[in-house]
Amino acid sequence: MATRPASRQRRASSAAAAVAVVRSSPQPQQQQQQQLPIPQSGSPTSTTTTTTSSSRLTPELSLDGPASPLFAGLDEDPAPKENVTVTVRFRPLSPREIRQGEEVAWYADGDTVVRSEQNPSVAYAYDRVFAPTTTTRQVYDVAAQHVVSGAMEGVNGTIFAYGVTSSGKTHTMHGDQRSPGIIPLAVKDAFSIIQETPNREFLLRVSYLEIYNEVVNDLLNPAGQNLRIREDPQGTFVEGIKEEVVLSPAHALSLIAAGEEHRHVGSTNFNLLSSRSHTIFTLTVESSPCGESNEGEAVTFSQLNLIDLAGSESSRAETTGVRRKEGSYINKSLLTLGTVISKLTDGKATHIPFRDSKLTRLLQSSLSGQGRVSLICTVTPASSNSEETHNTLKFAHRAKRIEVQASQNKIIDEKSLIKKYQNEIRRLKEELEQLKMGIITGTPVKDAGEDNIILWKQKLEDGNVKLQSRLEQEEEAKAALLARIQRLTKLILVSTKATQTSRFSPHPGPRRRHSFGEEELAYLPYKRRDIVLDNESNELLSPVEGLGMTLEDSKEEKKNRKGILNWFKLRKREGGASILTSSEGDKSSLTKSTAPSTPIGESVNFPSEPRISNSLVGESASVDLFSIGHGEFATDSLHGEETPLASRKTIDHVDLLREQLKILSGEVALHTSVLKRLTEEAGRSPNNEKIQMEMKKVNDEIKGKKHQIASLERQIPHSISNNQGMADKLELTPSYAELLEQLNEKSFDLEVKAADNRVIQDQLNEKTTECMELQEEVAHLKEQLYQTLQAKDSLSNSIMMQKNAGINHETDNHADQELSVPREVPGETSPKEPQSVEIDELKQKVCELIEVKAQLETRNQKLLEESTYAKGLASAAGVELKALSEEVTKLMNQNEKLASELASVRSPTPRRANSGLRGTRRDSISRRHEPAPRRDNNAGYEREKALEAVLMEKEQKEAELQRRIEESKQKEAFLESELANMWVLVAKLKKSQGHDLEDFDTKYIGS
């Protein structure tokens, strides 16, 4: 690399001096004890810089306290200020950079310092610096785990990756199946925290958006384009963004995979699939205490923003067209982000341009100090990107000086969605109890005589009918309430732990591991997406975390696990749109979108991260510790057996599922009958769009109901199998439970088959009707064919008879001529042809005459067109001949004029020329003394030559004109001959038509 200029070295020295000043900041313990003033909204009040890790607010909590460990001490004094957590992650050199001779320009000097290889005095200190061999799981534990924990406690959090293009931002945030990124690890950790907090209920919602060319698009709803950013007292928000309530990690990861399908990516010189937009994945967390005794307590509300920024691009990218436009918008938003961070840290009360870009406007509340912020800067050590890496490090150094204050958000009123769901569930349960306990009392029957027995009997029958209808209505209302309670209860997640245990132990222990199941890994890309354009792979060896195995065992395990994942991924993709599986076998109605696969040979991967379990059975056995529906979770051997209360809840849950299954089956049968009726109406009026729309709507409803039925069918056996101990207490043997399950399945299959049979029967009736109609049509066609064949036979017979009659007539005439004696027998007449034969013959002749007439008309039309064309040609030729004659006349006049001029010029010139020549021959001395006559002679000679040339040109033109005149005359003669031929043909045609008419008259009319 070339030597730095002097000015650049001075700037580097000043930066190093700044680092030295930063290193002399107080220690972490001193910072935590120091009570800093709360900054005003929008600008910081302190310019103190620090490079220590931001304080993790994890108080020492009691194990036997009545409150949850996550939410103990919420009403204490406000927490002290923190600095933004800034970490730096290096990616390894790619094979292409190694082949090109790239050198390491920046390196990690320890765990907290980044130093320049060219100028060791230039260094920057951060909370943590990760070497190229560091795994994403280690990055998450340091840079993101405390932010996720705070978000589950009610503190807003923001985690975003910043860096140039192809530095590994998307790999760090999203990862792949071998190394899940920050976003999958955060989602998994959030559900693990729910499992470890048994005395609180949680409601999780997610949204996923992108900022592409300064336009906000909803990735979960492709129709949500160009959304607007609004503001309210709680901060900025996107109007019209779609939020999905998530029930499991696989559910959330499937939404991320579906959103990634709609994200804008493109190819550049550095990346085969480069992110062309910023994405923000938001996890909204609401929680409240469990039980009705804590009904009046506030609901905690927080948002966790996981941001994947697009990489800044330099001029070396050499982009054009759309890519250049995208790069300009990306650089503009990142430049605005840098400006905002600079103004936040300079300590001056100046205007902060949050509104200059959509990205900074959405990050306004996070950067203004409301919540915890973690910045992960991804850099490349290559010398070709040394300047870009230096800019990223300076940006991270400025961001480290931002101060934030983590405070818990509480919602006292009824605006919380979880509070709304809880109140509605409570109200529906009360209504259900009223329906169960309600007793319909009739009017007491008074003593009546024998005369009124019939009247009272009739009234009693009427009352029974009314009571029966009322009972049916109440049963329907009960079923609807059960379905509503089940649907709402599924959305609220609670832990399976029956006892209160603390997440945080006073003594340090092993960190919680994040074991992903196969159904969760299926929604992550198999290979990292941000591929550097290369034909080689760069897989570095990473240490095995928590597993004491040798290098050969680790390689063999990764090889086997890769084969299992490939088999599972292929099976998923063959299915197309697969069904999402939750932790207890529930099927979500979301369609899985598989992220685009990338070539294996063109990737530069971070080190692979081995998981704890290495077999498909082990993964499925320890997939999730939470479940869906009625707040119940799968039984875990680590946390003991379920309590009797939980068992009773599970029994009620199974009953609810069965009731809902019956309701859905009835609804499917009802919708099927409605669809049948609409189909009949559509057959009668196929152009009615309203009926078509109703049919489509009913079909969609039937599909949704069938999908729900399939989901319930899978939930019921799973719930029964997870509670075999409870079944033993209730004297239900496994065989009886299996028989009951099979009975339910068979009954449902029978209902479905009955509905299918009805549909098939209707289709069969329609096909039978169509077959009968086709048979009638075939019989009719056969009859017509038979009649046609008979007519053809009669026609051929009549023709043969006519020919025979003609031959006999000629023979008789010949015989009469030879004998020349007429044989007339008085009183006898010659035999006549049958009248039918004559009629057929006349019809045939009429058809022939019609054909002849049509041919003649066609021929006349053609001749008329040809004659018209010939007349046009003749008139055009006459006009052209006239024009040519006029032109010839003009040229002849001009030729005569030129000839006269030439004659006048030629007459004196030869004499003067001859005399001059003789004079020059006689005496050369006399020519020297007479220059004027010689000049005149030369001028005359030149004039004569010019006139001769003009004359030759005129003669050539005259010859050309003469040739054209001859051609015109020939063309005129040809056209005249053609015209004459045409008239002859017309006359012949008229004559032939006259003869034909005469023949027709003589042949038919005369006879």
UniProtKB/Swiss-Prot annotation:
Biased composition (Basic and acidic residues): 920-941
Transit peptide feature, positions: 1-53
Positions of region (Disordered): 1-79, 579-607, 901-941
Coiled coil: 403-495, 687-716, 754-791, 836-907, 942-982
Subcellular location: Plastid, Chloroplast
SMART domains per the UniProt record, alphabetical: KISc
PROSITE patterns: KINESIN_MOTOR_1, KINESIN_MOTOR_2
MF GO annotations: ADP binding; ATP binding; ATP hydrolysis activity; magnesium ion binding; microtubule binding; microtubule motor activity; protein homodimerization activity
Keywords: ATP-binding, Chloroplast, Coiled coil, Microtubule, Motor protein, Nucleotide-binding, Plastid, Transit peptide
Composition bias type Low complexity, residue spans: 1-55
Cellular component aspect of the GO annotation: chloroplast; cytoplasm; kinesin complex; microtubule
A GO BP entry: microtubule-based movement
Record: residues binding ATP: 163-170
InterPro entries per the UniProt record, alphabetical: Kinesin-like_fam, Kinesin_motor_CS, Kinesin_motor_dom, Kinesin_motor_dom_sf, P-loop_NTPase
Keyword Flavoprotein: no
Stored SUPFAM superfamilies: P-loop containing nucleoside triphosphate hydrolases
Disulfide bonds: none
UniProt cofactor(s): Mg(2+)
Principal cellular location given in the protein's record: plastid
Positions of the Kinesin motor domain: 83-402
Similarity field: Belongs to the TRAFAC class myosin-kinesin ATPase superfamily. Kinesin family. KIN-7 subfamily.
Subunit structure: Binds microtubules. Homodimer.
Functional summary from the UniProt entry: Probable minus end-directed motor protein with a microtubule-enhanced ATPase activity. Binds ATP/ADP in vitro. Retains total enzymatic activity even after the removal of the ADP bound in the active site.
Name assigned to this protein: Kinesin-like protein KIN-7D, chloroplastic
Organism, as annotated: Oryza sativa subsp. japonica
